[in-house]
Curated annotation (Swiss-Prot):
Keywords: Antibiotic, Antimicrobial, Defensin, Disulfide bond, Secreted, Signal. Its main location: secreted. Disulfide bonds join C24-C52, C32-C46, C36-C53. This is Beta-defensin 128. The keyword Disulfide bond applies.
């Protein structure tokens, strides 16, 4: 019976932060730590007051996304208060 009580208590025990490293938020590829390792830089702070440590070498591998070049849109000569959308109904088919 005592062993059963110990098992029940251990099931409801909450693990501390040391069990698994938390990832940073805002799509930053890093981990929340008190001190960054050698070769890591801190980008932003985490919610728990720790640093968001990002591996500097791995961060350089990622190429920033480039937006495709858009051609200028021709403007209408008449100012319209609404947008005309193409619609298809049963009667037009």
């Amino acid at each position: 019976m005592k062993l059963f009580l110990v098992l029940i208590i251990l099931l409801f025990e909450v693990l501390t932060d040391g069990a698994r490293l938390k990832k940073c938020f805002n799509n930053v590829t890093g981990y929340c730590r008190k001190k960054c390792k050698v070769g890591e830089i801190h980008e932003i702070g985490c919610l728990s007051g720790k640093l968001c440590c990002v591996n500097d070498e791995e961060n350089k591998k990622h190429v920033p996304f480039k937006k495709p070049h858009q051609q200028p849109v021709e403007k209408l000569s008449v100012q319209q208060d609404y947008v005309i959308l193409p619609t298809i109904t049963i009667f037009t088919v």
